[in-house]
């Protein structure tokens, strides 16, 4: 008896030559709808699904393959006589190959004009049912969900007349990953649609983007995955124009740099090392912004990652070229700028759209045995409940500097202190176990620039000692959440030294 293949694909890439090759191996093709028409137009003999089921396609094609004549042929275990007897009794032929991919749900919901009804209509029912049935019975059925695997199947058929058991098992595992990811995407879409914030089970899916040379350290293996429908203004969806492959640490640092530069509407440049900003600058032009970021810390920027929120022009490119950098991220590069920067063969150049709204995504952090999920910290200065508890209010110039410090400090590892003037950071104290320690580092880094600068803190001052330290350094204004039981101590110290202090009511811990 001829072997039989059920072929029903939304992605028709390579299906005609694959089906032709199956026919050459004495395989009968059974097909549905558009796939059947495409194969017939190519001159391939095809049996219609209705001829197998004895039942027409109904409900606008919603019911085609959901039939015992199909699923019996897929699930029968060929080594069991009672299964074969039941197939014979009901005139059901075994199906040996299933070549199916699913309705384009992901592509549909990615379209801006897609409606909820469009999404629902592109939820495949029959396809996953056939794939899962075939994958469950992979000892007897070869199941193919990805056109990439056509060549492997045909090679094994040509070499040995059948598909190896190990290959069938690998293809079955791929099917279950595929259908799980498909269902996860649907679940995520519908969960978002009904506004469910903390569902009883979390279904997310990621697609492999690339293998990485290694992880955080050379002895650790690592892979880069991306969300199929993640924000376009993200490192996962960035376009690499030049340079060697991104490393695990590059990706983390680039993501951190991008998060900070998104805070600014004016021309801004951000330099990052080990996921902390070492310099942030703003200006009238992107060249001025980068010059300020460089001036903020000309030592730590060496080997760093730069993110800019305007096109890189040739003058900025010439300045960037003179510094050893790992990555430059920007919305675009002028042709002249590319000519300058691509002369450095290892420098990675990434582009992505930065004119999008700053889309908040859930942050998922894995822990041993589980995961933590939280909203992204997108709380802006405009939403803060500003209070000024000191006698002196900030001047206009201090307000600008305070806003810059506050935007940056929430992206610094806690405990965090940032010193800034109106256009740049001048000192960053990151990742310290106590706030005074972070302040000391920021002040030491700022040097003479500390005098006349302002201070931003990611959390409240537990005691008044940080204000005393700020006063000694010549810092004129402070922005912090407030809320300590000893706030009065900090306020009194600020008043004593003529420092203006702003409470935001918002903490920005980052771990």
UniProtKB/Swiss-Prot annotation:
<keyword id="KW-0808">Transferase</keyword>
<keyword id="KW-0511">Multifunctional enzyme</keyword>
<dbReference type="GO" id="GO:0005829">
    <property type="term" value="C:cytosol"/>
</dbReference>
<dbReference type="InterPro" id="IPR024051">
    <property type="entry name" value="AICAR_Tfase_dup_dom_sf"/>
</dbReference>
<dbReference type="InterPro" id="IPR011607">
    <property type="entry name" value="MGS-like_dom"/>
</dbReference>
<dbReference type="Pfam" id="PF02142">
    <property type="entry name" value="MGS"/>
</dbReference>
<protein>
    <recommendedName>
        <fullName>Bifunctional purine biosynthesis protein PurH</fullName>
        <ecNumber>2.1.2.3</ecNumber>
        <ecNumber>3.5.4.10</ecNumber>
    </recommendedName>
</protein>
<dbReference type="InterPro" id="IPR002695">
    <property type="entry name" value="PurH-like"/>
</dbReference>
<dbReference type="Pfam" id="PF01808">
    <property type="entry name" value="AICARFT_IMPCHas"/>
</dbReference>
<dbReference type="InterPro" id="IPR016193">
    <property type="entry name" value="Cytidine_deaminase-like"/>
</dbReference>
<comment type="similarity">
    <text>Belongs to the PurH family.</text>
</comment>
<dbReference type="InterPro" id="IPR036914">
    <property type="entry name" value="MGS-like_dom_sf"/>
</dbReference>
<comment type="pathway">
    <text>Purine metabolism; IMP biosynthesis via de novo pathway; IMP from 5-formamido-1-(5-phospho-D-ribosyl)imidazole-4-carboxamide: step 1/1.</text>
</comment>
<dbReference type="GO" id="GO:0004643">
    <property type="term" value="F:phosphoribosylaminoimidazolecarboxamide formyltransferase activity"/>
</dbReference>
<dbReference type="GO" id="GO:0003937">
    <property type="term" value="F:IMP cyclohydrolase activity"/>
</dbReference>
<keyword id="KW-0378">Hydrolase</keyword>
<keyword id="KW-0658">Purine biosynthesis</keyword>
<dbReference type="GO" id="GO:0006189">
    <property type="term" value="P:'de novo' IMP biosynthetic process"/>
</dbReference>
<comment type="pathway">
    <text>Purine metabolism; IMP biosynthesis via de novo pathway; 5-formamido-1-(5-phospho-D-ribosyl)imidazole-4-carboxamide from 5-amino-1-(5-phospho-D-ribosyl)imidazole-4-carboxamide (10-formyl THF route): step 1/1.</text>
</comment>
<feature type="domain" description="MGS-like">
    <location>
        <begin position="1"/>
        <end position="145"/>
    </location>
</feature>
């Amino acid at each position: 008896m001829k072997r039989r293949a059920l072929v029903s694909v939304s992605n028709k890439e390579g299906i005609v030559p694959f089906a032709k090759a199956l026919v050459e191996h004495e395989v009968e093709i059974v097909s549905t709808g558009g796939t059947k028409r495409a194969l017939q137009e190519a001159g391939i003999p095809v049996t219609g699904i209705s001829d197998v089921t004895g039942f027409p396609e109904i409900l606008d094609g919603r019911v085609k393959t959901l039939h015992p004549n199909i699923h019996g042929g897929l699930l029968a275990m060929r080594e069991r006589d009672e299964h074969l007897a039941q197939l014979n009794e009901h005139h059901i032929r075994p199906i040996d190959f299933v070549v199916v991919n699913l309705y384009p749900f992901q592509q549909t919901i990615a379209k801006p004009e897609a409606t909820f009804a469009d999404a629902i209509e592109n939820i495949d029912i029959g396809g996953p049912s056939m794939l899962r049935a075939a994958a469950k019975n992979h000892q007897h059925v070869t199941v193919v969900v990805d056109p990439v695997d056509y060549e492997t199947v045909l090679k094994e058929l040509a070499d040995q007349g059948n598909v190896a058991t190990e290959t069938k098992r690998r293809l079955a595992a791929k099917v279950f990953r595929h259908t799980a990811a498909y269902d996860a995407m649907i679940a995520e879409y519908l969960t978002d649609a009904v506004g469910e914030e903390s569902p009883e089970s979390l279904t997310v899916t990621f697609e492999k983007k690339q293998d990485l040379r290694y992880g955080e350290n050379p002895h650790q293996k690592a892979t880069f995955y991306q969300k199929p429908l993640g924000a376009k203004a993200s490192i996962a969806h960035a376009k690499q124009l030049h340079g060697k492959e991104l490393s695990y640490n590059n990706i983390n640092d680039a993501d951190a740099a991008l998060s900070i530069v998104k805070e600014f509407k004016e021309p801004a440049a951000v330099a990052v090392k080990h996921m902390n900003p070492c310099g942030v600058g703003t200006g009238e032009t992107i060249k001025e912004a980068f010059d300020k970021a460089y001036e903020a810390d000309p030592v730590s920027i060496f080997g760093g990652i730069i993110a800019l929120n305007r096109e890189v022009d040739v003058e900025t490119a010439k300045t960037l070229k003179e510094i050893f950098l790992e990555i430059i991220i920007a919305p675009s590069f002028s042709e002249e700028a590319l000519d300058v920067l691509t002369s450095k063969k290892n420098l990675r150049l990434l582009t992505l759209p930065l004119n999008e709204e700053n889309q908040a995504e859930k942050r998922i952090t894995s822990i041993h045995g589980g995961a933590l999920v939280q909203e992204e910290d997108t709380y802006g200065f405009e939403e803060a409940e500003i209070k000024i508890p000191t006698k002196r209010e900030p001047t206009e110039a201090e307000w600008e500097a305070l806003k810059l410090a506050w935007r940056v400090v929430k992206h610094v590892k806690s405990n965090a202190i940032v010193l800034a003037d109106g256009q740049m950071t001048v000192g960053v104290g990151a990742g310290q176990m106590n706030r005074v320690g972070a302040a000391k580092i920021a002040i030491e880094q700022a040097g003479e620039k500390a005098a006349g600068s302002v201070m931003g803190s990611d959390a409240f001052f537990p005691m008044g000692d940080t204000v005393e330290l700020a006063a000694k350094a010549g810092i004129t204004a402070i922005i912090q959440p407030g809320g300590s039981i000893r706030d009065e101590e900090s306020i009194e110290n600020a008043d004593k030294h003529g420092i203006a202090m702003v409470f935001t009511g918002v903490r920005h811990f980052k771990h």
